[in-house]
Each structure stands twice: as C-alpha cells, then as structure tokens.
C-alpha cells in the first residue's frame, strides 16, 4: 500500500520529524528492559527467544542488575527511567519481590510483562508492596486460540483471572497485549468485547514478525489484506471509544499514521529504550538480533555504552538501501524497526509494503 500521504498528514509528519531529530540527538534514556530470566512455563508458538522451563542461561543475579541501576542513577534522574521486567516469564523468579524492592529503593518506577499464569492474589499483593507500578498481561485470543498460541491448556483461564484481578485492584497502570495472527484475526471483535467486559481500558495489538519459532509458522503471518483489516479494526475501535486500542510500534503505516496510535511512528530502540539481557548483553529492544548488541554489563559500564555507542540505532543512513532507498516515506520511517533487520542488515518485513 504505497499510496501518497495526505497533505495534512505530511505536514504533521514533517513537524514530528524535527522533534524526533532532537530526541535522537539527546537520546534520553526513558525505558530500560531487564530480561531477568529466560525460564518460562509456556511454550508459545511465536516466541522469539525459544525459552524453556529450565533455560541454559541462568537468571541474572539481582546484584548484577543493581550495578546497572547505579550506573544509570549516577547519570540521570531515576524517576524518569521506567524499568520493565521481562523474560522468559518474570514470575518464574522466586526473588522477584526482592528485585522489585531493590529497584524501588533506588527510586526507579518499575513494571513487568507477564503471561499471568503465576499471578496469584498473594503474589500480586507482595509485588505491590515491592513498589510495582505497571503491568502488561498477554491475551492472544479467546480460550481455544489463546491456549493454542501459548501451548498450555488452561492458560486462557489463568490469564483472564489475572487480568480481572489487576483491573479490579485499580492500583497500577495496566494494559493487555494481543499478538494478532491468522487464527485469532477473525475473532478480534469478540476479543475486544470480552476485554471490555472484564473492565479493561487499554489494549495493544501486535502482529507476529517472522523470527524465532514464528519464522517457520505460516499460521502466524497475516496477509496484506488482513493487515489492512487490522488497521481498520483498530481505527474503528478507537473511534467507538469503549476501549483505547493501539497498534504497537512495529513500523511506519502511511496514511494510518495518527489513526491507530496516539503518536506518529518512531523506533525508539537505542534512542530512549535500552535492554539488559539475561546474559548481560546491552541492547535496545530485547527482540533485536545479537548482531546489534552494543556491549555487556560484565565488561562495560552501562551508561558509558549508552552515551558512546548505539550509533547504528541513532544514525540509520546505513539502512538506506534495497527497497528503503526507493521508498517515498524514507524520511518518516527511517528504515523501519531494528527488530526487523537480519544479521546482514536486510529488512525482513515491511508492513506498509505488505499492505
């Protein structure tokens, strides 16, 4: 779908681009993801890390990540940096509450992404007492589709119970994420209504990009027509106003920009977003290939790496090749998301082109 941008949209994008240029120049760290474990109790069809219940890479010791936070605190205001705890499945760590207290005592707001399986009322209470500020739970369709995607019977019921519990508590910022695939795509309206029935206010939708297990599973990849249908669905849901639906930061969307997200597209990886992976690697988003890691906390100071490296993320002229070199939207897209680049720098997928 390579249609020309409307004049109004082009003007808005030009203004936004200038603001984005300033953000890139300043690269203020605003989100830090901590891959605290690679262990997981699910067997998701779309998993990019191919996690297992007993991972070969051990959990990162809390003290090691604490040193990273000390590096950040020495250079910036901790209140402005959100720590997002991910995995694997974070709830597999028995010391997660202790990790939360450590982050809280160092004055960082923190949240987590979970499948909800282990989120009992008792565990949730302890996490709140440890300073938990935000949470995201995954729900990939209604019962049959979710359990199929997650590879564990009963996972839908457990996720739903966790979602309802967090909503009813009303104590933290909360959203649900859904990975849209060919199987759950026809049922998105039913999923939306189910989530509204639970009382959910914010819902993020992703497509599944072809890496990890998903690279060899055609049931997970939407067609161009289905991607357009997804955009129209999000657009209509936002207009309806019963729930705030938003498409994820997966790439530039042409004339859907401004309609399916609250902001215009920008890949924040390496600009305001960084990650510390389970093996100590310093990266941007955890889903980006190891070829683009910028250092390792076991030999580098985190903030030194953040301030002196990450050039491939902040200067993307190296992406100006192949289809990107002839794309009329290059100056707004800047080569798409870093998670969509292979080990040779080639773009794996462009949603706009696919539409």
Regions found by a protein language model. Name each.
Residues 2-134, 222:
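Conserved alpha-helical substructure of the radical SAM core
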Residues 7-28, 287-355:
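Flexible mid-to-C-terminal extensions adjoining Fe-S/redox cofactors in radical SAM and related proteins
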Residues 13, 55-56, 60, 129-140, ...:
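Radical SAM enzyme [4Fe-4S]-AdoMet core and its adjacent flexible, acidic
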Residues 33, 37, 41, 264, ...:
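Residues immediately within or flanking Cys/His clusters that coordinate Zn2+
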Residues 39, 43, 47-50, 270, ...:
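Cys/His-rich metal-chelating microdomains
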Residues 52, 88, 140, 208, ...:
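Flexible loop residues that form catalytic
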């Amino acid at each position: 779908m390579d249609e020309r941008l409307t004049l109004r949209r082009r003007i808005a994008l030009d203004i936004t681009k200038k603001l984005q240029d300033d953000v890139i120049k300043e690269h203020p760290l605003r989100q830090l993801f901590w891959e605290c474990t690679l262990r997981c109790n699910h067997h998701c069809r779309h998993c990019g890390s191919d996690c297992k219940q007993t991972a070969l890479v051990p959990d990162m010791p809390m003290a090691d990540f604490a040193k990273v936070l000390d590096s950040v605190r020495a250079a910036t205001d901790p209140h402005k940096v959100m720590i997002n705890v991910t995995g694997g499945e974070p709830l597999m760590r028995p010391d997660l509450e202790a990790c939360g207290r450590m982050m809280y005592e160092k004055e960082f707001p923190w949240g987590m992404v979970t499948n909800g399986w282990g989120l009992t009322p008792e565990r949730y209470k302890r996490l709140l007492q440890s300073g938990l500020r935000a949470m995201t739970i995954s729900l990939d369709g209604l019962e049959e589709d979710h359990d199929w995607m997650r590879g564990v019977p009963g996972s839908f019921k457990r996720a739903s119970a966790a979602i309802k519990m967090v909503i009813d508590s009303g104590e933290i910022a909360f959203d649900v994420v859904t990975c849209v695939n060919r199987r759950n795509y026809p049922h998105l309206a039913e999923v939306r209504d189910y989530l509204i029935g639970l009382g959910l206010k914010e819902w993020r939708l992703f497509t599944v990009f072809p890496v990890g297990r998903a690279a060899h599973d055609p049931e997970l990849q939407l067609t161009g027509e289905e991607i357009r249908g997804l955009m129209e669905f999000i657009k209509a849901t936002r207009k309806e106003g019963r729930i705030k639906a938003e498409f994820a930061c997966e790439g530039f969307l042409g004339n859907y920009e401004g309609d399916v997200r609250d902001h215009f597209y920008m890949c924040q990886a390496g600009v305001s977003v960084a990650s510390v992976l389970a093996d100590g690697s310093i990266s941007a988003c955890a889903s980006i290939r190891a070829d683009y890691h910028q250092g390792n906390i076991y030999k580098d100071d985190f903030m030194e790496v953040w301030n002196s490296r990450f050039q491939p993320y902040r200067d993307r002229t190296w992406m100006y090749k192949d289809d990107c070199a002839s794309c009329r939207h290059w100056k707004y897209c800047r080569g798409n998301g870093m998670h969509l680049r292979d080990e040779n720098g080639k773009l794996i997928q462009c949603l706009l082109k696919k539409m």
